[in-house]
Amino acid sequence: MRFEHKDILDMESLSVQDITMILDTAEGMKEISKRPVKKVPTLRGKTIVLLFQEPSTRTKSSFDIAAKRLSADSISLSKSTSSIVKGETLIDTARNLEAMNPDIIVLRHPSSGAPHLIAKHVNASVINAGDGIHAHPSQTLLDLMSVREKKGELQGLNISIVGDISHSRVARSNITGFTKMGANVTISAPATMIPRGIEALGCKVAPDMDSCIENADVIIMLRIQKERQENILFPTEREYAALFGLNAQRLKLAKPDVIVMHPGPLNRGVEISNQVADGRNSVILDQVTNGVAVRMALFYLVAGGSRNADTI
């Protein structure tokens, strides 16, 4: 079965079958990363442009490593090294890149909808690496992979998401992705950090963190995104940590085999304690590992792959 999407822009456009195909393919890709020689010729001759207009550590390096492990040629452009700083529009940048015939453009941008706009103006496949507060599909896919690895299935799991929901593209994509795969999603945050109408995405809003994480199978913690906040949304970090921080005592409210996740970067001592972040329930580093596998799968599939990666 051939993957039918030219672009990966959000979780809404992916069906359950699409998501399952991506996760199955990523499992095969993960095996490649365990080999002594972590490279296959699958995308030799393909060119991938990483156009990142916001700071990134994990996502950018993960996409870059994914491209190289598939033998693609990758070029990395940041805001400071592109002509955008000279006043060039994003569309003009994309058209100029298109003139060089890349196969895939990976875009991170501070404006919601930017990858959708670019996808309309280029023939290359576009993968959204995070756009404003809108979406971060590859993060959700690696989260789904991490949960499926640990729990065996996604259907019926209780997923708790706690933190700055209003400014989090990860929260929006995860709510959509996990509910689409049959999980039950409950969120919690200060009232100033919960967007109006978020329930329309299929989640429940808990009155406080304790009730949110009670009997949870998975807890996803989110950092406070101060860089996107125009006003002060809580009194102090200490008060926030007391009400919405995940510590060892609060973790006991969840199921004994709960897994704790975080998209990074972590603000230790604020939304998550050192003991929890580094404890036995944490799968935060597994998420990073799976991020490479998922992004390898996305490159492979949008480039025309039609099966899982077991024989690559």
From Swiss-Prot:
InterPro entries from the UniProt entry: Asp/Orn_carbamoyltranf_P-bd, Asp/Orn_carbamoylTrfase, Asp/Orn_carbamoylTrfase_sf, Asp_carbamoyltransf, Asp_carbamoyltransf_Asp/Orn-bd
Binding site for carbamoyl phosphate: R58, T59, R108, H136, Q139, G264, P265
Residues the record lists as binding L-aspartate: K86, R169, R223
EC number(s) from the headed UniProt entry: 2.1.3.2
GO biological process, one term: 'de novo' UMP biosynthetic process
Record keywords, A-Z: Pyrimidine biosynthesis, Transferase
Classification via PROSITE patterns: CARBAMOYLTRANSFERASE (PS00097)
Catalytic activity: carbamoyl phosphate + L-aspartate = N-carbamoyl-L-aspartate + phosphate + H(+)
Organism domain of life: Bacteria
Protein name: Aspartate carbamoyltransferase catalytic subunit
